[in-house]
Amino acid sequence: MHTQNDSSGLPSIAAVVSHDVTDFDTWQRAFDGSSAARKGAGIVAAHVNRDAANPNQLSVYLASNDAERLNAFLSSRDLMGTMRDAGVKGPPAIAMITPVEDQTVKDRPLAGAIVRHEVQDFAIWKRAFDGDSDARRKAGIIGHAVNRGLKNPNLVVVYLQAESVDSLRAFASRPELKAVMTAAGVIGAPDISFVTGGAWTN
């Protein structure tokens, strides 16, 4: 099992690009074909997630160490043309995030959950998240990543990995989770997307 947990090796910035596609296989071929363009733009890692209920709804994670080059890539006409030709439906939603911790499993595709919520204080929330590690492990959560919103650092985006979506759904619906999140200072109800993750590439 390969995980990355050295914070010094984290990329400095990342984008989560969400959109629907007409046909995933067509889109995947175009995505694979643009690998050189991503590398040329300074993107060091890419990970595609497909919504568990709607496999043509995608969330694409792109990591970089150069915010200017990443933004230029995301706003380029070449990318817009590639996405259009790949069957992307409508304009993508782009969320810029700052990676904080990466303990994801990268040696095989896994089910995932993308959890988004605001917190009152990130440090307090992180202590509570770390304190819940045994519960995650017992629930079959084998990998995770923590990110903060670039414009709003109290917006937290957590990526959880397990062998099955059912394990993630069971963890998210456990009765005590609401109390844990309330004590951690989570504001409002979290937004949770269950996904199937693909291979990690660049």
Identify the residue ranges that each predicted region occupies.
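Short S/T/G/P-rich N-terminal loop/turn motif that feeds into the first structured element of a domain
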Residues: 1-202
